[in-house]
């Protein structure tokens, strides 16, 4: 499990949102930064990505993923499969410790270095140390409220931050 971050993504109707907290924890016991941006828009603002794990590793993977998107003309499904395959097989990349959540208006995926590419059945994904809390909160909010995808993502992350010591309330939300 990766400490020091929480990312949650929610797809609802024609909208998709991803939210990330801003905490960077060093050596599992010291907050180094509280305003980090762990969610981004890629491919001319058409793809959302959030990452958990080692910062340098996550940035490297984000750059690799952006290359795949360019090579595949923005085809998210093909790009994540190619990234996961390369991530698992490449001697350098397979040592990277990170997880990614990626989404466009049609798909939402969790991608890992062990080759997993998972598209959740309920259109909600959460990773990082606060991921289980954010996932549970997002599911409850999706089922019991009329909130938008962005509002659900923000509230789910706020709930996770109130429980997980590796997650803070400095939340960035991006939406398509």
From Swiss-Prot:
Protease subunit of a proteasome-like degradation complex believed to be a general protein degrading machinery. The active site is at 5. NCBIfam families: ATP_dep_HslV (TIGR03692), PRK05456.1 (NF003964). This is ATP-dependent protease subunit HslV. GO terms for biological process: proteolysis involved in protein catabolic process. It is found in: Cytoplasm. GO terms for cellular component: HslUV protease complex; proteasome core complex. InterPro entries: ATP-dep_Prtase_HsIV_su, Ntn_hydrolases_N, Proteasome_sua/b, Proteasome_suB-type. Transmembrane segments: none annotated. A double ring-shaped homohexamer of HslV is capped on each side by a ring-shaped HslU homohexamer. The assembly of the HslU/HslV complex is dependent on binding of ATP.
